[in-house]
Amino acid sequence: MSKQHARTSAGSNRKFKPFKITMMSTIAALFFGSSVLVSTVKADDSGMAELKKVLQGQIALMKPELQEKVKGLSTDTKMLLMSILAMHSHYSDKATLRQVMLEVLADYQSMVMGIMTDSSEMTADAARRLANHRIPIGGLLPYMGMENITDDRLAVLAGFNDSVEGNSIKLAEAADKGDMVTAASLLGDISSGCVGCHAVFRPEIPGTSDLLR
């Protein structure tokens, strides 16, 4: 893991402002192997510049065979992956996916505790933390296994993202209004999304990767 740490971009557990993505095809090309469009990113767009650094660091950490597999994905898949990543503002150069998933579990449990104790603030805060969970070192793809880096396989991420992150935001909004009944009703949808994603992508040894340098 020390080599992974040394090769990633500087700074650990960095927190960035949410990114407004207006040219998804440009960003996808930037992330997934085309240097031609790098110059189209405006220099004064600090959010875009930070995202560029993060994504270049993720690509650099991938072993060559994974880099080639990722570059071969369709534009639609690349744009989907970028749209998911752009929803997050916490990127780590230390945490593995296993560690991130433990954080997600803790946030889920905090949501349940908040609902059971009728604490709208605890519930909403935990739900928003879950929705904006940390992205692990190297990004998400290295932990999914080479066999899953295909257009068909990755297409299901959209539904899982809506089930987990999307419903977590809805749960937070319901808690903000004091509507704990609606908040509670969303727990099942969130957990179903988690279980479904695990069924598709979780490897034999969860949360680790042999596809990082």
Regions inferred by a protein language model and the residue ranges of each:
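N-terminal secretory signal peptides that target proteins for export/translocation
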Residues: 1-19
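Cleavable N-terminal export/targeting peptides
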Residues: 2-3, 26, 39
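Bacterial N-terminal signal peptides
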Residues: 24-35
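Sec/Tat signal peptide C-region and signal peptidase I cleavage site
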Residues: 36-43
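Sequence context surrounding c-type heme c attachment/ligation sites in exported
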Residues: 44-213
